[in-house]
Amino acid sequence: MNFRHRSYQSELLDQPDIPFEDIQRNMEELNFINTWLGGHAITLTGVEALVNARQPITICEIGCGGGDNLVAIQKWCKKKNIPVAFIGIDINPHCIDVASKRTLSNIQLIHSDYKDAQLEKQPDIIFSSLFCHHFSDREMVKQLQWMKSNARLGFFINDLHRHKVAYYSIKVLTKMFSNSYLVKHDAPLSVARGFTKDEWLQFFNFAGISNYSIEWKWAFRWLVVYKNADTRNIKPE
């Protein structure tokens, strides 16, 4: 496989007719992977980069899935004594149904394409995790612009680094340990659909956005953080 360019092969999870039981199993295994390979820790690092002291914050996740990231953030905010409200947006109704059963307080769940979501209030922070690689390059530029326009403090992205070591490692691990045909097929493909640092730089350049950082994180993730340059002048609503 050539990792110089992104794969645009469709993931099974993006098909509209996947049975709910299969989606649920997929989400359970992804949560396990995020827990043990540091995915949730990267998300918490992104939150920490954007929070203002202990002021109340509203955090919105686009492509929220079953709400695992939001649960991890809620636990972190509780330890830090940070009052937090959540918005979770997902185009898949099964994901919203699973998220609605999580122990999340003060949350608005929206079944919608993120671009069409009707937000009750402007989020302080918008983020996504393992979401961006589902989109084309052109869609990614528009997504960055949408996140910038709708977040008061800034946004962050936790997504995959396209690399042959990551690809073959996850391919072997999921073949050995996964019980989900979705994970076995989509996990290595997700890496092949992931990004290089140069591609992120190009996306931000085309989007006309500055004041951002791109950090490589184990295991083969990018943490991309944009901070609103006027954050110091923003007061809580």
Predicted regions and their residues:
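N-terminal, positively charged/glycine-rich alpha-helical extensions of SAM-dependent methyltransferases
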Residues: 1-28
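Class I SAM-dependent methyltransferase Rossmann-like catalytic core
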Residues: 20-46, 50
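Class I SAM-dependent methyltransferase SAM/SAH-binding core
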Residues: 60, 66-116
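A conserved beta-strand element that flanks and buttresses the S-adenosyl-L-methionine
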Residues: 127
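A short, conserved alpha-helix within the catalytic core of class I
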Residues: 135-146
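Conserved beta-strand signature within the Rossmann-like core of class I S-adenosyl-L-methionine
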Residues: 152-160
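C-terminal alpha-helical "lid/dimerization" subdomain adjacent to the S-adenosyl-L-methionine
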Residues: 160-204
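Conserved Class I S-adenosyl-L-methionine
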Residues: 193, 197-228, 237
